[in-house]
Design a protein with these regions (language model features):
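Short, thiol/selenol-centered motifs that function as redox-active sites or metal-ligating centers
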Residues: 42-51, 75-76, 170-175
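Short active-site neighborhood of thiol/selenol oxidoreductases, capturing the structured segment around
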Residues: 31-49, 153
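Thiol-/selenol-based redox modules, centered on thioredoxin-like
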Residues: 119, 124-125, 129-175
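Short, internal strand/loop/helix patches
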Residues: 86-119, 124-125
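Bacterial N-terminal signal peptides that target proteins for export
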Residues: 1-9
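C-terminal motif of bacterial Sec signal peptides marking the signal peptidase cleavage site
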Residues: 16-19
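Structural microenvironment flanking redox-active thiols in thiol-disulfide oxidoreductases
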Residues: 49-88, 99-106
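Bacterial signal peptide processing site
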Residues: 21-23
Length: 175
């Protein structure tokens, strides 16, 4: 089942968001007709820190075709704190600041690190966990057996149906 974002609202929201490279100007990188991955981030969330390597690997594997963006909602984190997080974990991710939670609310995002894979028509093809490493908060699996986002990206590339379009995100609450 695809979740269709209201394109008008999506574009209006994106017009108000700001980028990490110049937080005083609107970020228009997402206002295009291409697929994209949005990762809800919080620099203090231990799970966001744990998944930085996975984000980098996915960006290496898919980033030429499908751009990745980090989304930092609210005003709790300064651009300096976000930049420090990106540098500490060597994460080459463009950041979209969402100070008024507009994008967060449009996506119905509640958790970091929650991921959204959105196609060129702004349909949400996948949302939720990166993988099944966490069975629940505080309980980790010994072995990952499901790579939800990676599998969704692979399916998209070959035009196949995405087997698992949604999982329940586990992590830190967006504040």
């Amino acid at each position: 089942m695809l979740i269709k974002l209201n394109q008008f609202i999506f574009f209006v929201i994106l017009g108000f968001l700001t980028s990490c490279s110049n937080p005083t100007e609107p970020h228009y990188a997402l206002i295009n007709n291409s697929a994209k991955v949005l990762v809800m981030l919080s620099p203090d969330c231990p799970l966001c820190k744990n998944y930085t390597k996975d984000i980098s690997e996915l960006m290496t594997a898919f980033g030429d075709e499908i751009p990745f963006y980090g989304v930092v909602s609210g005003t709790f984190y300064s651009t300096l704190e976000v930049d420090s997080f990106l540098q500490s974990y060597k994460l080459p991710l463009d950041i979209i600041y969402d100070p008024d939670f507009l994008l967060c609310n449009q996506l119905d995002a509640t958790i970091t690190p929650e991921v959204f894979f959105i196609d060129e028509n702004n349909d949400i093809l996948y949302s939720g966990l990166f993988d099944n490493w966490l069975g629940e908060l505080g309980r980790r699996r010994s072995f990952i057996t499901e790579y939800y986002l990676k599998d969704a990206l692979k399916a998209y590339q070959i035009g196949a149906t995405i087997k698992t379009p949604k999982t329940k995100a586990i992590g830190c609450f967006i504040e």
